[in-house]
Curated annotation (Swiss-Prot):
Entry-linked PANTHER family: TRNA (GUANINE-N(1)-)-METHYLTRANSFERASE
EC number assigned by the record: 2.1.1.228
Subunit: Homodimer.
Pfam families the UniProt entry points to: tRNA_m1G_MT
Gene designation: trmD
Name of the protein this chain belongs to: tRNA (guanine-N(1)-)-methyltransferase
Reaction catalysed by this enzyme: guanosine(37) in tRNA + S-adenosyl-L-methionine = N(1)-methylguanosine(37) in tRNA + S-adenosyl-L-homocysteine + H(+)
Homology family: Belongs to the RNA methyltransferase TrmD family.
Record: residues binding S-adenosyl-L-methionine: 117, 136-141
InterPro entries recorded: Alpha/beta_knot_MTases, tRNA_m1G_MeTrfase_C_sf, tRNA_m1G_MeTrfase_TrmD, tRNA_m1G_MTases_N, tRNA_MeTrfase_TRMD/TRM10
Keyword line: Cytoplasm, Methyltransferase, S-adenosyl-L-methionine, Transferase, tRNA processing
Cellular compartment(s): Cytoplasm
């Protein structure tokens, strides 16, 4: 899989790729990641990427030309199959991104282009040139770079040979459940003790205990997810 992030702050995005799981995935050649500053595709001598908004609204809006020029160029010249690419804006107006979407994208045979917005966002006509938009939540951040990195990270860690399969199967949101509570040494800290079953050595009992704790944890902390879990059992 190849994932390209289009941004005005390429150094910021690229710096994240030097750490942890993303770096391991790159070292293993499990994924190809590229970052492109779309300012270079602006037509004027000042490399202008934003302009005022029709109708008098406050702020500046990203111009269409640099983004569309960039998309056309990289789709033709930087991917193996131009017909197997999905392109998404990162926008609070997009489809809410969740673990199910991450799994679907990680298992797709399509490469990915993510466009990080800035200022007041995108000229509405950009939707004619992309497959959709993704939102990482109902809040506003300064730019789409952090959102793009969330999407990249969540996909890459699901790709083959990046993370141990057993670790993935027990993570939060698997089957709509949060992770079960976990403990480390010391056994007793100021009267708060580790549940004795976890020290029993009985793997079947431990698995059953952890499963029930995951259910209880989800019901208490995320009742919305718990309802999805219950519905999924039917």
């Amino acid at each position: 899989m190849k994932i390209v992030v289009l941004t005005l702050f390429d150094d910021f995005v690229r710096s994240y790729y030097d750490f942890s799981i993303i770096k391991n995935a790159l070292d293993k050649k499990a994924v190809e990641l590229e970052v492109i500053n779309f300012r270079q595709y602006a037509n004027d001598k000042h490399k202008t990427v934003d302009d005022t908004i029709y109708g008098g609204s406050a702020g500046m809006l990203l111009k269409l030309e640099p983004l569309v020029n960039c998309l056309r160029d990289i789709k033709q010249n930087q991917f193996k199959d131009p017909n197997k690419i999905r392109t998404y804006l990162l926008s609070p107006q997009g489809e809410v991104y969740d673990q199910n979407k991450a799994v679907a994208l990680s298992q797709s045979d399509h490469d990915l282009i993510l466009i990080a917005g800035r200022y007041e966002g995108f000229d509405e006509r950009i939707y004619h040139y992309v497959d959709g938009a993704l939102s990482v939540g109902d809040f506003v951040i300064t730019g789409g770079e952090l959102a793009a990195l969330i999407v990249v990270d969540s996909i890459v860690r699901l790709l083959p040979n990046v993370i141990n399969k057993d670790s993935l199967s027990s993570e939060s949101f698997n089957n709509y459940l949060l992770d079960y509570p976990m403990y480390t040494k010391p056994y007793d800290f100021e009267g708060y003790k580790v549940p004795d079953v976890l020290l029993s050595g009985n793997h079947q009992a431990i698995a059953a205990f952890n499963q029930q704790e995951a259910i209880n944890n989800t019901k208490m902390k995320r009742p919305d997810l718990y309802l999805k879990y219950k519905s999924n059992l039917k």
